Structures are given as C-alpha cells and as structure tokens.
Amino acid sequence: MAPRLRRNVSMLDPQHRAHAAAADPTPGAGGGVAVRVRGLRRVFGEQVVLDGLDLTITPGEFVALLGRSGSGKSTLIRILGGFDDGVEGEVLAARRRSVVFQEARLLPWKRVLPNVTLGLAGRDVAERGRVALAEVGLAGRERSWPATLSGGEAQRVALARALVREPDLLMLDEPFGALDALTRIRMHALLQHLCRRHQPAVLFVTHDVDEAILLADRVVVLTEGRFSLDVPVAVASPRRRADPAFDRLRATLLAELGVDDLAAATH
C-alpha cells in the first residue's frame, strides 16, 4: 500500500498552493512516493540555503544525503519533518514520519519507556513501547533514566521512539555522528535490520561517505543548495570496502565533495 502523503500546503507561497492542492499523491502506475519535492527554495535573509531542489523518494527506498557543512542538509530534514514552513515550492511527505537527530533528545525527567511512547495514545501503547525497545536491544530498560544510558543506548531509544510510530518515512540527521567507531558499526547493523523489518523510506544525512555507501540504495550530494549528484549504490551485498565497485563510488563521491582519497584517509 502506498503511504499516505501529507500535503504541506501551509509551507507553500501563494503561487504554488494551487499546484500542490491538485497534486496526485501517488504518481506512477500502481506505485507511490514517500517524498516528492519540486522547486524547493529556502532563503534566510539574503542567504539562499536551498535553491530549486527536486527530490523523489519511493516507499522502502534508503537514500543517503551527503554534503559539506552548511550545504542545507539539516534544513531539508527540518522542512520534510514539518518544522520549517518558510519555503517556496512543492513539498509532499508521508503523513506518518519520524526524525532521529544526532542528539537523542530524550526528556531527562521521564524514564525510557515514557520517552519512547511520548505523544501516543491507546491501551496498548506501553506494550508497543516495550516491543520497540526489545527490537533495538533494550528489553528490560523500560524504567531506566536517560542519564544512565550510554550514547549508543540513547540513540537506540531514539530509534525505538521513531519506529514505534510505524513511519512510512524515517529521517535520520547524522544519528551516529557522536558515537565511537565500534558503536557506529553496531548501529549500522541494527539500522539495516530495522529497515528490513519495518520497510520505511529513509532519508539519512551523513558526512561519512563510507557510511552512505554501506547503508543506502542511492546517494545524493547537496552542494550550495542544489543537488549536484544523484547515483544508485551499485555495490554487491554484503558491501565491503575492499570491493572495487565500493572504491570507485567512494572516489566519485569524494571528488564531488571536493575531497581526495588521501585527505579522506588521513582525516
């Protein structure tokens, strides 16, 4: 079933509203979209942060978003999440959507389970929360306080909080950026498992080219407010850094980002 799309008409300036209201939320024969952006523009003062973006993400597709700091990646996430409505253009996003940020953003005065189920209603909410925590490897930690969690555990709670809502669109804004290397590897495996199980469309923001290739079906590069590259990840699974196809794609992405292999290796 195609995900229900939210028409973010309130985000659009008057010249685009009629077009958005008439838009078909499920274009294509028998298919659908989790995200459809056309001509998206975001300006802060005199600074153009996003300049005419077009982006489509299909149900179940995992898209990694790369770009230098300040290129507009987090701004795009905020817009798709409904946190920023000062935009021009057409923005359609799945109604059921969740966001995970680099910081877990847990409420310190609530225990783990209430953090996971925050804002949900229904008699089965607590059980759904426990199931979500078990899925991320935190069964039995329902009554723990956020302050007692490691960085990796806190991000697991954030993932549980996102997935308990069964989103059609899961957005992750550098969720593993503050974690150590070993914890990141474990979180990669967990995310892959959860995505196979729940099958949301994913928009994954990262600075790590290897991480993007390891996880994504497709990689897009944002450069000065525009998409400068959009490529499929044509690397056989299980993906290995030693695979020549992995190395070629890495070189392509690093070149697009203006970083050579030597600089990346010594970073």
UniProtKB/Swiss-Prot annotation:
The keyword Transport applies. SMART domains: AAA. It comes from the Bacteria. Pfam families: ABC_tran (PF00005). ATP binds at residues 67-74. Residues 35-249 form the ABC transporter domain. GO terms for cellular component: plasma membrane. It is a peripheral membrane protein. GO terms for molecular function: ATP binding; ATP hydrolysis activity. Keywords: ATP-binding, Cell membrane, Membrane, Nucleotide-binding, Translocase, Transport. It is found in: Cell membrane. It catalyses: ATP + H2O + aliphatic sulfonate-[sulfonate-binding protein]Side 1 = ADP + phosphate + aliphatic sulfonateSide 2 + [sulfonate-binding protein]Side 1. The complex is composed of two ATP-binding proteins (SsuB), two transmembrane proteins (SsuC) and a solute-binding protein (SsuA). PANTHER family: ALIPHATIC SULFONATES IMPORT ATP-BINDING PROTEIN SSUB, TAURINE IMPORT ATP-BINDING PROTEIN-RELATED. Belongs to the ABC transporter superfamily. Aliphatic sulfonates importer (TC 3.A.1.17.2) family. Part of the ABC transporter complex SsuABC involved in aliphatic sulfonates import. Responsible for energy coupling to the transport system. This is Aliphatic sulfonates import ATP-binding protein SsuB 1. It comes from Frankia alni (strain DSM 45986 / CECT 9034 / ACN14a). The lineage of its organism: Bacteria, Bacillati, Actinomycetota, Actinomycetes, Frankiales.
